[in-house]
Swiss-Prot record:
PROSITE patterns membership: RIBOSOMAL_S13_1 (PS00646), RIBOSOMAL_S13_2 (PS50159)
Stated role: Located at the top of the head of the 30S subunit, it contacts several helices of the 16S rRNA. In the 70S ribosome it contacts the 23S rRNA (bridge B1a) and protein L5 of the 50S subunit (bridge B1b), connecting the 2 subunits; these bridges are implicated in subunit movement. Contacts the tRNAs in the A and P-sites.
PANTHER family named in the record: 30S RIBOSOMAL PROTEIN S13/40S RIBOSOMAL PROTEIN S18 (PTHR10871), SMALL RIBOSOMAL SUBUNIT PROTEIN US13M (PTHR10871:SF1)
Biological process terms in GO annotation: translation
Annotated InterPro entries: Rbsml_uS13_C, Ribosomal_uS13, Ribosomal_uS13-like_H2TH, Ribosomal_uS13_bac-type, Ribosomal_uS13_CS
Entry similarity comment: Belongs to the universal ribosomal protein uS13 family.
Keywords assigned: Ribonucleoprotein, Ribosomal protein, RNA-binding, rRNA-binding, tRNA-binding
Protein name as it appears in the record: Small ribosomal subunit protein uS13
GO CC term, one of those recorded: cytosol
Any one Gene Ontology molecular-function term assigned to this protein's record: tRNA binding
Organism: Roseiflexus sp. (strain RS-1)
Taxonomic superkingdom: Bacteria
Keyword DNA-binding: no
Length: 127
């Protein structure tokens, strides 16, 4: 199993799909990496030579910020927004949508589950 940037790539998938398992590399970046490494995108991961894997690994480590470094950078950017107190930072702090979506209805993904509905419970009828 090929290991690139700390991620084990699935052996049975084509390399163009398997490389997207690395956080920070999508389809277009993956295709660019394979082009630079001179690797056929249709090749299965199990059929890659050690030399091809090392070329891909070197390009990813040299030119892309991936996995832990990218996650850390994203978290630091959000923390910076919250620290300076801008509108986007306040929305992050409140757990609300940041990009202008409506919140009167919807926005459940960002706001979480609804609370318990307060209502009248039906009484059981004794016979």
């Amino acid at each position: 199993m090929a290991r690139i940037a700390g991620v084990d790539l699935p052996r049975n998938k084509r390399i163009e799909i398997a490389i997207t398992y690395i956080f920070g590399i999508g389809r277009s970046n993956g295709a660019e990496v394979l082009r630079k490494a001179n690797v056929n995108p249709a090749t299965r991961v199990r059929d890659l030579t050690e030399e091809e894997v090392s070329r891909i690994r070197e390009i990813v480590e040299r030119e892309y910020r991936v996995e832990g470094d990218l996650r850390r950078e994203i978290q630091m950017n959000i923390k910076r927004l919250m620290d300076i107190g801008c509108y986007r930072g306040l929305r992050h702090r409140k757990g609300m949508p940041v990009r202008g979506q409506r919140t009167r209805t919807n926005a459940r993904t960002r706001r979480g589950r609804r609370g318990q509905a307060i209502g009248i419970k039906k009484k059981t009828v004794k016979k």
